[in-house]
Design a protein with these regions (language model features):
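N-terminal intrinsically disordered/low-complexity leader segments
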Residues: 1-26, 218-224
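Generic hydrophobic, amphipathic alpha-helix propensity
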Residues: 26-35, 52, 77-89
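Helix-turn-helix
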Residues: 30, 38-72
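Short hydrophobic clusters on alpha-helical segments that form packing/core surfaces
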Residues: 31-39, 85, 114, 180, ...
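Alpha-helical DNA-contacting segments of helix-turn-helix folds
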Residues: 74-81, 132, 149
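Hydrophobic alpha-helical connector segments
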Residues: 76, 90-119, 173-176, 203
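Hydrophobic alpha-helical bundle segments that form small-molecule/ligand-binding pockets
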Residues: 91-100, 120-126, 131-136, 146-173, ...
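Hydrophobic/aromatic-rich alpha-helical bundle segments in the mid-to-C-terminal region
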Residues: 126, 139, 159-208, 220-224
Length: 224
């Protein structure tokens, strides 16, 4: 019963895969799934093409028929990640989802969800950040994704305007996302010596910072 109640709660957020063409993309997705898992765990430079193909149960030749090199693979991973992030935002940042929640409950859940996403994919987040510094395609996708997430979060904040201390909620949404994602990206690159995102206290304090910026406080049961 508790599991069912948790799944029904608006604060229970999950990563969503964007729709795929099952058969035509099966082999490609096997490579991308393997690469995403390995890069998330080990990092991009530490993951070899052989590691990826062995995990995907395919051949090195099959890899190079699809990608010129590992950088081409990273491009494909980033493209899929951005599509999945949009699909996830459509669910997680749907204002109707939060109709019966308070603003601080909503912001707390979203902040913790972002921590979970980066914690589970820290090697991938690090690779995307480094790639975006020199790859204009990755950088442009990041900008478009940021705009999309900002619009979605702004719509959620708009439905709780009376609880918040901002007039320009789109700007508030952008700064909230920058506060969270920039801190988490920094942690992904520099590791636990800078900020230990495996420590639940880090998630609590990031959530507190986001809530207070928006003029709210943490939910009373959120100091966990």
């Amino acid at each position: 019963m508790r599991t069912a109640q948790k799944l029904e709660s608006p604060t229970f957020l999950q990563w969503v895969r964007a729709p795929q063409q099952a058969r035509s993309r099966a082999a490609l997705n096997a490579l991308l799934d393997a690469a995403e898992r390995l890069v998330s765990e080990r990092g991009f430079e530490e993951t070899s093409v052989t590691d990826i193909t062995e995990t995907a149960r395919t051949s090195v030749g099959s890899f190079y028929r699809r990608f010129k090199d590992k950088r081409g693979l990273l491009q494909a991973l980033h493209e899929r990640f951005c599509a999945d992030a949009r699909a996830t935002a459509d669910v997680a940042l749907d204002p109707t989802r939060w109709a019966d929640a308070t603003a601080n409950e909503m912001v707390d859940a979203i902040a913790r969800f972002l921590v979970d996403i980066v914690r589970e994919r820290r090697g991938l987040a690090r690779a995307f950040l480094v790639s975006g510094a020199s790859d204009p395609v990755v950088r442009e996708r990041d900008v478009l994704l940021s705009d999309y997430l900002t619009d979605r979060l702004a719509a959620c904040l708009e439905s709780h305007r009376s609880e918040l201390a901002h007039d320009d909620l789109r700007l508030a949404a952008r700064i909230t996302l920058l506060l969270l994602t920039s801190t988490l990206s920094h942690a992904a690159v520099l590791g636990p010596a800078e900020l230990d995102i495996d420590d639940p206290v880090s998630a609590t304090e990031l959530s507190r910072a986001a809530c207070r910026y928006l003029g709210s406080e943490l939910p009373t049961d959120s100091n966990r």
